[in-house]
From Swiss-Prot:
The gene is ibtk. GO terms for molecular function: protein kinase binding; protein tyrosine kinase inhibitor activity. ANK repeats lie at residues 51-81, 86-115, 119-154. Residues 685-704, 970-993, 1058-1089, 1208-1237 are annotated as: Disordered. Keywords: ANK repeat, Cytoplasm, Membrane, Repeat. It comes from Xenopus laevis (African clawed frog). This is Inhibitor of Bruton tyrosine kinase. InterPro entries: Ankyrin_rpt, Ankyrin_rpt-contain_sf, BTB/POZ_dom, RCC1/BLIP-II, Reg_chr_condens, Signaling_Regulatory_Domain, SKP1/BTB/POZ_sf.
Length: 1339
């Protein structure tokens, strides 16, 4: 498109321009958008429409990632700009519309992930709100524990004393498959309760507070063995002791007992193991809950509360008149002993205890009093207390006078509201969150400095009380806060916790130094789980048996049963059948066991051949089928077995024949008489044995049953399993009836057994050797079947088989091949190892093993490795794993975006992730920005600015069609021409030409006139044209089509029809297209009639003025000037446009000259065609010209060569002069011998930077006779140089090629050639010197 300077400046604020920009961004392609934004307006990237949206907002909303990157890197747009409608940045919009690839690009360029919109939502909040509605986080779900803090006393459970600034996963629990449901953090230790009721502790063990029976420090959580047999439901802890409640309602305590807080009688100083509290006051009572403070322990039942420990005012009792400071046995709080009272919640701190009844009454036990704080607070979910003031006289060595903090009580109801009471004397108030949006809580934790919250959406927050300021009277805020005296709020400022997105519970220690949050397992809602296909183990070996033949290289034993041959495999037979194991190990079998088997030499493949007699081949086939696949047709319901009567009939006939005998009494009798006598004898014998036969009828019927026959055969071979399974099978009405099906054993092989039958040895890349069996490898894997059963070198190699696989992975592959199971993979916790197995399984096409690996990896997906596994699955075509990873990433998008874990993904995978994420959210179907069609017309951009890219594709397509048409025409045309061939040993074959590689170009000829030239080449005289070629294969295959370059050459193709008569003038005109230029516009064609003289016409001209020359002279002159791209003319007939010139010897050129001279003497009209061609091949100095000179003898040529050697050095000056346009007389050019033309063309080809002046106004050359012929020695030298250049190019090292490729790519980036709408830049290797054409040598 012609560049139009914009009518605005860099401060343009035109609303119309903004609308046009947004319209183009919504509907145009990325390339067109860049062109439009660069040329339409000087301020196009920052203009905003009525809604405050700019080009960056719309590009992020439409998923135009390339445009977005171009705006950020090239235009430097501000990513923090918000729109007017919602206050959204480009990051908000990209996430809202589901374009995760754009969101990651924005994050990489510094976009703020925590910036809030008008409603207080950050981009992460949008992800959270888009979570599918079926995902609800519960404490009963599988969970993960995250902790952070100063970790001074090893209370976080990470195994180190290093502090954690952000929530980090406690990896001990996921590794052991433990899910936590409650955690308690104290100053010196932490307590964790699993969902199965097991208790884990870590921290400092002084005093036995960990319950492990010692006082050692535990860096990671350790199971309390004393409670292993007692499933627990609740835990509580304080600074020095721990309290545990079991499912049976029993309470166990352990730790220091300084203040008698353990409740054990008699009070010990401490307890290193859990001990049960056994108090007479609680006999028959079922404890529902426990709580603990530093100085006391609280237990409660349905209707009573019991406390024990130091009485500093928090136990709910009055001071003891006898001065007793400790309560050693649990004692009921009498102040809460009301009628019909039901205790639901209890909590304790160091200096206070709070209780909640079923009626909603809240009581505070502090300062020796029981205060009722509120009533009718129904549906409370949790209550907490912090602080409290103790009487320092109760423990002067531990308490300070006027020490402690005022008590604070927090209550959480089922609706997610939080109520607060602060001492002294205030009322219960609802908390008011100072945050951008409304929050509803699901859990709360309290310490002396702040409050920890978990919302119903899984978010985590920390809150602090806001200091009250003096408010002016009659202000709006004052009116809002005091409009209702009963609805006063407690303001709490909120700050969101990072990396918390699926929280269900939160905990903190009393001092606020360490924290813990319980999050739902990220795989909880994952339903795209890989599956493993059914096993094909038995089918593989049954296929091996069916495909075995006597000539393959896999079988190693053959059995001849009757007239049938059964190739088999010794390892499988010996492992599955004891009979064959003995047979192969000893070489012979005991005649008493099986007298019908004997060895009979070798088969056709040189394997052992055994003959088995007195067994039908069909029965033996069933036996082999069972051995190989652990089943056979006789065990299938409804099978119709064959009955084997043929052998019995044959035996009867033979027996009768033997009974007839050859006695002398039958001599001279007819056959009828002999037959009649034998029949009479047979009837007599039948009558005699009638009674005996009736007794054996039943046994004979059993013997003829195929099931019984197979069962007897199985017993002979020692197949007890087959025999026992046939007991549940009957043969009824010609079918198999299975009335009792016994359980089948899984078919498995053992690699280490039958070591005498090893025939393959594999060697891993780390040098470990594995002995294997060829038959098992070939049966299980097509990879080994193709390698070992064919004529590859591996099949006949006697040494070990080198496998580029590590020994650990190779062992897994072999275990799967032999057993169809991979316990090593299923039990492995190393995901990288399983991934390595999957890679090898993918390479060896082991589909089922790959599926097993996918299932194992999917079970081990975490937030840390999800992105890497997704990239891995996409790389190795693990489709099931990829679907699991895509859904996992989509369900945990917020956590992964905040952790920047998705930065490792490639662009293609990010595009797939964006599509999967949009499909996961149903509302994404409605979030589509409709293209604005009222903007400027961008069709001009498509037709002009991007025309070069489109025209190149069109040229390729159209010229391919032209090539196909030319080949079809060349096949049909030879029938019309006379073939003149003196010797069939030379020349080209048509098949060789058609099968030769063609060079594609960007030329669109109007008409292809090279067919005649092709036929002339095919039918040319082999002696005159290709003398010296021993066979057609020794010649280089011609390239029928030109090669593309940026330069455009012209070639004159002269075609003579040797058999057809002259054509009348004007009968057929030939189009002559002008050579193409860089401009896409077409140039009018000029015509020439066949009546044009075939000879060059010399026109009178003046040396002082340019002369209009004949077209043919101009074209030949242009050809000589640009001889680097000229065509060789093999004879007077036509030539091929753009063919690669082949190498001709001196004798060949001489014979060509002779044949061309004879053809030139014939006065026949010629058709002249000018075809535009583009050549990128080096010039050939021996290229023949159009007008060949007179024929000379070999002696004359030698004399001429000697003379030219002496005068050749003087050509340098002439070569320099040839850089400029020469003044050449066309008549003199026509009379000049061909050798001179060739020499001049050669010299001009070597001169770079020729002046491409107008060919219609060329001046004549004044010194056109100072040229010398090229010698034969120079031709040979140039041949050697070109051959050396070809060798250097062929032997160029790969490292150097890669460096060149890298340099090309760097240059393309430097000049911004990729997707550049303004200019088209290409970078290619430049050929330094001419190079010989590579040729294939036939060996």
């Amino acid at each position: 498109m012609e560049r139009v300077w914009p009518e605005c400046t860099t401060r343009c604020r035109s609303l119309q321009h903004a609308l046009d920009v947004i319209s183009v961004v919504t509907r145009a392609s990325e390339q067109h958008i860049k062109v439009f934004l660069s040329s339409y307006c000087c301020n196009a990237v920052t203009l905003k429409d009525d809604f405050g949206r700019n080009a960056t907002h719309i590009a992020a909303s439409c998923g135009k990632k390339n445009v977005l990157d171009w705006l950020i890197t090239g235009k430097g747009v501000d990513l923090a700009v918000k729109d007017k409608e919602s206050g959204w940045t480009a990051l908000h919009r990209s996430i809202f519309y589901g374009h995760i690839d754009c969101a990651l690009s924005l994050l990489k360029h510094g976009s703020n992930l925590y910036i809030q919109d008008k409603d207080g939502y950050t981009p992460l909040d949008l992800v959270m709100k888009d979570r599918p509605p079926h995902i609800v986080f519960k404490t009963s779900d599988p969970t993960e524990l995250y902790t952070w803090g100063d970790n001074v006393n090893f209370t976080l459970g990470h195994g180190t004393q290093q502090s954690k600034h952000h929530p980090e996963l406690v990896e001990m629990f996921p590794r052991s498959g433990v899910y936590i449901k409650q955690m308690v953090l104290c100053k010196f230790h932490s307590v964790f309760l699993s969902q199965k009721g097991q208790v884990y502790t870590c921290g400092h063990g002084q005093g036995g507070r960990l319950g492990h029976g010692d006082e050692l420090t535990c860096l990671v959580p350790r199971l309390v063995e004393g409670l292993r047999g007692h499933p627990c439901t609740q835990v509580a802890g304080a600074k020095d002791h721990t309290v545990v409640l079991t499912e049976d309602g029993y309470v166990y305590t352990f730790g220091l007992n300084t203040f008698h807080q353990l409740g054990i009688q008699p009070p010990p100083p401490n307890s290193n193991v859990p001990r049960q509290i056994q108090a007479k006051t609680m006999k028959g009572k079922t404890v529902l809950g426990v709580a603990a403070g530093r100085f006391h322990t609280v237990l409660w039942t349905k209707d009573a509360v019991y406390t024990v420990g130091l009485n500093g005012g928090q136990l709910g009792y009055l001071q003891d008149p006898n001065g007793e400071k400790f309560v050693s046995c649990p004692r009921q709080v009498s102040a809460l002993h009301h009628k019909d009272i039901n205790i639901t919640l209890v909590s304790a701190s160091d200096g206070a205890t709070v209780c909640v009844s079923e009626r909603g009454d809240i009581y505070l036990l502090s300062e020796y009093q029981c205060k009722k704080l509120a009533s009718k607070q129904l549906n409370l979910k949790k209550v907490l207390v912090s602080g409290g003031i103790l009487e320092h006289k109760a423990a002067p060595e531990h308490l300070k006078e006027n020490g402690g903090q005022p008590a604070s009580v927090f209550a959480l109801d089922q609706a997610g509201r939080v109520f607060c009471w602060k001492s002294p004397g205030s009322s219960l108030k609802q908390c008011w969150w100072v945050y951008g949006r409304q929050l509803f809580m699901s859990d709360v934790a309290l310490n002396k400095n702040e409050i920890m919250f978990v919302t119903q959406d899984g978010e985590g927050f920390t809150g602090k009380w806001m200091l009250e300021k003096k408010k002016k009277e009659n202000t709006i805020s004052n009116i809002m806060c005091h409009s209702d005296s009963q609805n006063v709020y407690e303001k709490i400022s909120m700050q969101k916790l990072p990396f918390v997105h699926r929280a269900v519970s939160v905990a903190t220690d009393p001092s606020g130094c360490n924290f813990a949050v319980l999050q739902s397992d990220p795989k909880t809602s994952l339903f795209e789980v890989p599956s493993v296909s059914s096993s094909v183990f038995a089918e593989d070996f049954e296929k091996l048996l069916n495909e075995a033949n006597e000539t393959d290289s896999i079988h190693d034993v053959t059995f001849q049963v009757g007239t049938k041959i059964f190739p088999a495999h010794k390892y499988i037979l010996a492992l599955r059948c004891d009979f064959f194991s003995k047979l192969f190990s000893s070489g012979e079998i005991n005649s008493l066991d099986f007298p019908e088997v004997h060895q009979k030499g070798e088969d056709a493949a040189g394997c052992d051949l055994f003959v088995i007699e007195k067994i039908p081949p069909e029965l033996f086939s069933h036996v082999l089928q069972f051995i190989y696949s652990d089943t056979c047709d006789m065990l299938l319901q409804g099978h119709k077995p064959k009955l084997w009567h043929k052998e019995e009939n044959e035996n009867t006939i033979i027996c009768n024949f033997q009974k007839m005998g050859f006695r002398e009494d039958i001599e001279g009798k007819s056959a009828y008489e002999v037959y009649k006598n034998s029949r009479i004898c047979a009837e007599n014998e039948k009558q005699k044995g009638k009674t005996k036969q009736s007794k054996k009828t039943r046994s004979i019927g059993d013997e003829t049953s195929p099931v019984k026959m197979l069962q007897n055969t199985a017993k002979k071979f020692g197949l007890s399993n087959l025999s026992s399974r046939l007991d549940g099978v009957r043969y009824e009405n010609g079918r198999i009836n299975v009335f009792h099906k016994k359980s089948e054993n899984k078919l498995r092989f053992n690699q280490k057994k039958c070591s005498s039958h090893y025939d393959v040895m594999m060697k891993s890349e780390d040098g470990k050797e594995f002995h294997c069996h060829k038959c098992v490898l070939c049966a299980r894997l097509e990879y080994f079947n193709s390698m070992l059963s064919s004529s590859w070198i591996e099949a006949s190699c006697c040494s070990q088989l080198e496998m580029p696989i590590h020994s650990d992975v190779l062992q897994v592959i072999l275990d799967y091949i032999y057993t169809d199971e991979v316990l090593t993979v299923k039990e492995s916790a190393n995901v990288e190892f399983v991934c390595n197995v999957l890679v090898i399984a993918d390479q060896l096409l082991i589909v089922r093993l790959k599926e097993i690996c996918e299932v194992t990896i999917a079970e081990r997906i975490t937030l840390k490795n999800a992105a890497e596994l997704l990239e891995f699955a996409a790389l190795y075509n693990a489709d099931q794993l990829k679907l699991s990873c895509l859904q996992f990433v989509g369900l945990n998008m917020g956590a992964l975006l905040e952790a920047r874990s998705l930065d490792v993904l490639s662009d293609d995978v990010l595009k797939d992730l964006s599509e999967a994420y949009r499909k996961m959210i149903p509302s994404m179907n409605k979030r589509i920005i409709t293209p604005y069609l009222d903007g400027p017309d961008i069709s001009i951009l498509q037709s002009e600015d991007i025309e070069s890219l489109i025209s190149v594709q069109d040229d390729i397509y159209s010229y391919q069609i032209t090539q196909e048409a030319t080949l079809k025409k060349s096949k049909a045309k030879p029938k019309k021409k006379q073939r003149k061939r003196l010797d069939s040993s030379g020349g080209y074959n048509l098949s060789d030409i058609i099968q030769s590689p063609t060079s594609t170009g960007f030329v669109k000829p109007e008409k292809t006139n090279s067919v005649e030239s092709l036929q002339d080449l095919l039918t040319s005289d082999s002696e005159g044209s290709f003398v010296g070629a021993s066979s057609p294969r020794d010649l280089q295959s011609p390239d029928l089509f030109p090669v593309f370059t940026h330069e455009t050459k012209e070639t004159i193709c002269v075609e003579r029809n040797r058999s057809s008569p002259p054509v009348a003038n004007g009968a057929a005109s030939t189009k002559m297209p002008i050579p193409t230029t860089s401009s896409p516009k077409a140039i009018p064609m000029s015509r020439i009639t066949p009546s044009t003289s075939p000879n060059w016409v010399a026109m009178p001209c003046s040396p002082a003025s340019p002369v209009t020359m004949d077209l043919r002279a101009i074209m030949e002159l242009e050809e000589n000037i640009q001889k680097c791209g000229a065509m060789p003319k093999l004879n007077a007939g036509g030539t091929k446009p753009g063919t690669h010139v082949m190498k001709l010897s001196q004798k060949q050129r001489k014979m060509m000259a002779m044949s061309s001279k004879e053809s030139n003497n014939e006065n026949k009209p010629a058709k002249v065609t000018v075809a535009p061609t583009t050549i990128k091949s080096p010039a050939k100095t021996w290229a023949a010209a159009f007008h060949l000179g007179e024929n000379k003898s070999f002696r004359d040529l030698l004399l001429e060569e000697k003379q030219s050697v002496t005068s050749f050095p003087s050509l340098s000056s002439d070569v320099k002069k040839s850089k400029h346009t020469e003044e050449l007389d066309p008549s003199e050019l026509a009379r000049r011998p061909s050798g001179t033309l060739n020499q001049e063309a050669k010299l001009k080809c070597d001169v770079p930077n020729q002046d491409n002046s107008n060919p219609w106004h060329l001046t004549l050359s004044k010194n056109n006779a100072s040229s010398a012929p090229v010698t034969f020695t120079a031709i040979v030298e140039e041949e050697e140089k070109q051959e050396a250049a070809l060798i250097r190019s062929r032997e160029k090292p790969l490292a150097l090629i890669q460096i060149e490729e890298r340099a090309i790519q760097d240059l393309l980036l430097h000049y911004q050639a990729i997707d550049n709408p303004e200019e088209y830049i290409t970078i290619e290797r430049a050929a330094q010197i001419p190079m010989a054409t590579p040729m294939w040598n036939k060996h």
